């Protein structure tokens, strides 16, 4: 085994047991004292510091959040389509013209896979 394999094995799984074969699992110590002992010999060049998290950017006038689902479930609440909503979307153009539901559930467009 090469040096890297030994180093990887020692770092990840801990030192090899003195007795027992390869079939035995090694217990990994997760206590803080064992972690402190392993990092004593290590030094870091330079300091690592994270900047403070920036505040969430706010544009002027964006105090109220827009609920996108409100315009879907309550079409009259959408300011841009309030005027035309009832005339265009809710009423058919001709008295006997088919609606979306008529088209969806007609024999031509109904799913054959049942």
UniProtKB/Swiss-Prot annotation:
Family matches, as PANTHER family: DORMANCY-ASSOCIATED PROTEIN 1, DORMANCY-ASSOCIATED PROTEIN HOMOLOG 2
Entries under Pfam families matching the protein: Auxin_repressed
Organism in which the protein naturally occurs: Arabidopsis thaliana
Protein name: Dormancy-associated protein homolog 2
Annotated segments matching region Disordered: 87-114
Disulfide linkage: none
Family listed: Belongs to the DRM1/ARP family.
